[in-house]
């Protein structure tokens, strides 16, 4: 939504709302869960400001800047949602590129700070990679790499997301990868898709 709203005032941004997406990919062997979008992306300073500060919410600041007519639901508006990733991951990497800017990678183990470095990334948007923790005697983190668990979490926490949420899956028998859409664009849910 941030990209769409910025495109209304920035004529350099060309946004086809029907091509915006959120994509998930899991790798059980490497214990990785990746969430990627082709949204607005973040600059180096935005990564530091929005992810490097607990309870700092760039989403909330964006939402507060809208007019009353611009009713919108924004994920992460309280600034602590992102940090819940460290409940299941021992390391989080965020790669992001904003239009017209360099791309950067933010990395943290959730314990003592973070690192940011410049990277090569041509596509605008953000990719978050969670390095899922190993199981312990009391916790089964494997479930966060199971398709049914991920699908249930998507439906529970992201039902209001306007854009499609897709997940790459691999058929264990054939090895073929497919892209399944869990939440389809629901035009009745959002008037912007009726244009």
Across the structure, where does each feature detected by a protein language model lie?
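GHKL (Bergerat-fold) ATPase N-terminal catalytic module, capturing the glycine-rich phosphate-binding loop
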Residues: 1-144, 152
